[in-house]
Amino acid sequence: MIRRYYITLGAQTTAGGTVSSASHADSIDGVPIALEGDKVRCPACDAEGVIALDGQRLRETLDGREVALGDDLCLCGCSPPPRLLASQAIACQLIDAAQA
């Protein structure tokens, strides 16, 4: 099984960026869960990016948008795009390796 942890407000990217917006529809330990299209501030390129989905996942939406998971992308000015790093280890999706 592959574990992909949910991304929450304040999570970092591989380029040192920070998730700066998230849904208030659900939270983990009181911290809002980030969704596809939420904003990420990237200091590496000095731009504001957005979360884009990447990789295998179970379909799960809040407010009509897919939840963000660890290793999803930050679409900003960086090339290649930075990856999101989960800042919590409480909640994740378990994906069968055969599906990946």
Which residues fall in each region the model found?
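Intrinsically disordered, low-complexity proline/glycine-rich segments
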Residues: M1-A100
